[in-house]
Amino acid sequence: MEKNKISIVVPCFNEKEALPLFYNKITQVFNQMSQESETAGLSYELIIVDDGSMDGTLDVAKELTVNDSGVKYISFSRNFGKEAAMYAGLQHAVGEYVAIMDADLQDPPDMLPEMYKALMEEGYDAVGTRRVTRKGEPAIRSFFARKFYRLMSRISKANMVDGARDYRLMNRKYVNALLSLKEYNRFSKGLFGWVGFKVKWLEFENVNRVAGETKWSFWQLFLYSLDGIVAFSNAPLYIASIAGVLNFIVAIAAMLFIIIRRLVFGDPVAGWASTVVIILFIGGIQLLSIGILGLYLSKLYLEAKDRPIYLIGESNIEKPTEKN
């Protein structure tokens, strides 16, 4: 660990157009902070994690290293996902303080001085950011995002804030806590809340990306949310169990109704349609329960194989520093 240094982790996937704009903006912020008395002694490093980009993002990262020794890059052997990219960046960061930022400038670099001030003067271990509006985002995505955060807050022990971004500044204690969680199926928004510590939240208006297109489709976000639920809650298993108990109670009640009607009124209950509906209903509940169990078992299977979270194709950093 290097004292008085801020490491900026920037996960990138096909961000060739946005990366130079991000670099210009973040260096402006660095220069401004270096001129202020409170932050004059800080040094910086920029860790660009190329997550298997196919548009020349790695070439741009290499160009930035030519004139700036503070720029580091890690290039994966293939696309491993943003979660892996963030984890790799945290492992290789040497700074006493570490920030995670997206390259599309949807995470305003101008907030960095205020975040650092909160760590130093107010005693926080991490400063997170959250969007107070979702301007420019499809309405249906905003609706489901809000519902997801509300649901996760109720069914899990991870403190998840609505509108929270991955953009945050953390001290070394907080970073080491995250690095101690070596699970393969990572859901960082949940992990940030699970580790606890003293966290301050700063709010900002939503900003559209400066270049390129979002890499997250609605379907990908849906699957990502399922991963989060499975990773941090047993609620789906409880729901499946409760559904099974309710089905059993309904079946017993129906059986008693048929027996009583036959014995008391001598009127047998007929009708194949009702029988088919009941069978389909119970079968649907069974398939749903099997699917829920399958999700949990598949995650256990991936964890049991103990494969690395990512593989590096090339980098100008010698080795990880997760034990700092």
Label the model's feature ranges.
Residues 1-4, 134, 187-324:
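Hydrophobic helical membrane-anchoring modules
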Residues 8, 26, 89, 104, ...:
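Residue-level signature of catalytic and energy-coupling elements of molecular machines
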Residues 11, 36, 49, 118, ...:
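Histidine kinase transmitter module recognition
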Residues 11, 76-78, 168, 241, ...:
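Short conserved micro-motifs on helix faces and helix-strand junctions that flank
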Residues 14-17, 106, 110, 179, ...:
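Residues in soluble alpha-helical coiled-coils and helical-bundle/repeat scaffolds
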Residues 76-78, 82-92, 97, 109-191, ...:
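Acceptor/aglycone-binding surface of glycosyltransferases and processive sugar-polymer synthases
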